[in-house]
Amino acid sequence: SEGELIVAVVREVKQNGAYVDLDEYEGIEGFIFIGEIASGWVKNIRAFVRPGQRLICKVMRTRKDNKSLELSLKSVSEERRRDRLAQWKNEERAKQLLNVLAEQVGWTKEEHLEYQTDLTESFLTLYGAFEEAAKTPESLTEIGYEGDWIQPFIELAVKNIIPDTVEIRGRFTLNVDQ
């Protein structure tokens, strides 16, 4: 949707812009017009983008064919670019962990896909599901998940995911000698 930040990989660079593939959307391509590559005048587009490069772009509009998007590179701040890339990397990592789990517990492709979709819907992101399980192991069963995959899921989460915040309780004494 318009204004969304998406992950794109440059497929082809032309004089007037760059064609990109969208990792998260199968069958939809993007185009970054030369005027949306960078602020200011772009003399050589290849100095800014090259094939195979991963970019974070802002969706400007959906073209009439509904199969391609017009994107902007210049309207994404460095901070937002970094945050979105970190989010994408975390999600890729979570997919890898779920692959490990699927193999471990013997899920079929259909089960694997179904759990991936369900967990993503329940926790907004797949990474969010792992993060929540690492922080609060009972979070999965509390919202109705059950099965022999829960414990290995929690173990993978605890081993591989570092939560944003950790609560530490205890007594702390500090002596200062003058």
Give residue spans per PLM region.
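Single-stranded RNA-binding regions, centering on S1/OB-family and related RNA-binding modules
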Residues: S1-Q178
